[in-house]
Amino acid sequence: MYKIKYQIEAVFLIREIDVAEGKSSKGESFLKGTFVLTIAGFVVKVIGSLNWIFVSRILGGEGIGLYQMAFPIYFFAMTVSQAGVPVAISIITAERVALRDIYGAKRVFRISMMLMLFTGIFFSILTYLAADWLIDWQLIRDARAYKAVVVLAPTVFFVTLLASSRGYLQGWQRMTPTAVSQIVEQIFRVVTMIVLASVLMPWGLDYEAAGASLGAFAGAVTGLIVLIYFHIRLERDIARDYGTDLKPLSGADYESRCSIIRRIFKLALPVSAASIMLPVVSNLDLMIVPQRLEAAGYSISEATELFGYLNGMAVPLVNLATILTASMAMSIVPAISESRVLGDSTRVYNQTAASVRISNFVCFPAFVIVFMLATPISSLIYNAPGAGPAVMISAVSIILLGLHQVSTGILQGLGHPTIPMVNMLLAAAAKVFLNWHLTAIPWLGIMGAAWATAADMGVAALINLYFIYRFIGYRIEFLQLLKTICAAGIMAASVYAFYTWTMAWWQIAAISTFGAVFFGCGIYVTAMILLR
C-alpha cells in the first residue's frame, strides 16, 4: 500500500485521498470512475432528450400513449429482476479482489451470471404472459398496447445479463465499461426506435409503438456485446498479472456457492426495494398533489398545469444537476467495500469525506444557478415562466439529493444496503404527510409540494449521515461546509448582479442567463480558492 495524493487545491481544498496500490488489471480510482460515469450520464440524457423530439413527431400523442402504457410494465419487471444486482455483485467482487482472491472473484461472476440467466428467463416469460392478463383485466385500457408489451419481454432477459456484467466490472473498479456500454446502448436504442417507428408507420399505431419498444431490445443486446469486449480485456489483464493457474482461497476467507447466492440476494433485495419505491412515491404524488391543489382553490386544469411544472419540469432539472453525485454513488460502492474488507478504516473515512466534499462542491453552485435563475431557465428551456416558483423551491433538493445519493453509496459499500432503503421509506412517509398538508395551503400551492420533495431527500440524507457517523465516526466538517456556503453566497450575489445588469443593458434573456451561469461559476471557484 502507498498513498497517491490528488492535488485538487482549486476544487477540494487539498484533500489527500488514499488509494490502494494495485496491479494494472485493477481499475480506476473512484474519482476517475465518477468522472467517466458523469460524462456518460450526461451524453445519455442528451441523446434521450433528442430522441423524444423525433419519436414524438413520428408517433404523435396517441402512439406515445401506447408506448407509455407498455413501458411501465417493462420497467417494473426490469427493476424487480435486476435493480440491486450490480451493487451486490460489485461489493462481493471488490471484496474478493481486495483479498487477492482472483479465482473467487471470477467465481462470483460465474455464479451471478447463472443466477441472472434463470432470473432473466423467468421475468421475460412473466412479462410476455402479463401482456394478456393486463389487457384482459383492463389494467391496460387500450388493447393496441399488447404488441409493445410483448416485444419488450425478451429485453428483460438481456438487461439482467447486463446488470451482472456491469456489477462484476464495477467490482474491479472499472467504470469505463459501464460508461461506454450505456452510451452505445442508448445510441442503438434511439436509432432503432426512430427507424422502426418510421418503417412500421403504414402498419398502424400499434406496430409503430411496438417498433419503438424494440429499441430497448436493440440497446440491451449491443450494450451486452460491448461488455463482452471489456470482459475479454479484463481476462487478458488478469492472465498477465496473476497468471492462468488461479487457486481458490482456503479457510475462513473461502465462500461457498450458497453463501454467495445468499449474499447477492441479501445485498440486492434492499436496493431493488428502494428502486421500486421511487415509482410508487411518484404515483402517490400523482394521486395527492393535484387533489390537494384543488383543495387550495385551483381548478382541475390549473392543478394539472402546476403538477406538470413540478414533475415534468422542475424534477428533471434536479436530476440533471445531480448526474455527478449519482455517478459517484455508483463508483464509491466497490471502493469503500475494498477498503472495508482490508480493514483500512482510515481509507474508508477519507473516501467518505472526499465523496461528501465533492457532492457539496458540485451541488451548492448547481443549487444557486437553479434557485437564482429559476424563471429565466424555465422560460428558455420549457417556454413556461410559470414553472419558476416550483423550479426555484425544487433547487433545494439538489443539495439534499446529492447528499442522499452519496451517503447511500457509502452505506452500501459498508455492507448496509438495508439502512438506506428503510430511510427512504421513512422519508417517503414524511413526504406524503407534507404533500397532503403543505400543498393545500393557498399561498404555497405547488411550492408546498416542492418543499415536501426537498424534505423527502433531506430526511433520507440526514438519517443516512447519522448511520455513517455511527459506523465510521464521520461527520460533515463544519468549517469546510461554512466555506462552501460562503462561496455559494458570493456566487448568488454575483449571478443576481450579472443577470440584472445585462438584462437592463441588452435585454436578451439567453445571453443574460448563460452569461450569469458562467460568470457565477467562475466567481464560485475563485471564492473557494481564496477561502481555502
Where are these regions (language model features)?
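C-terminal transmembrane helix end/exit motif
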Residues: 2, 12-19, 196-200, 218-252, ...
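N-terminal membrane topogenesis motif
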Residues: 1-47, 103, 107, 250-275, ...
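Short membrane-interface helical motifs at transmembrane helix boundaries
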Residues: 122-141, 365-383
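Membrane-interface helix-loop junctions in multi-pass transport and translocation proteins
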Residues: 176, 187-230, 418, 428-462, ...
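Helix-loop junctions and terminal segments of transmembrane helices
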Residues: 83-98, 319-344, 352, 356
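Signature of the first transmembrane helix
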Residues: 29-90, 95, 124, 128, ...
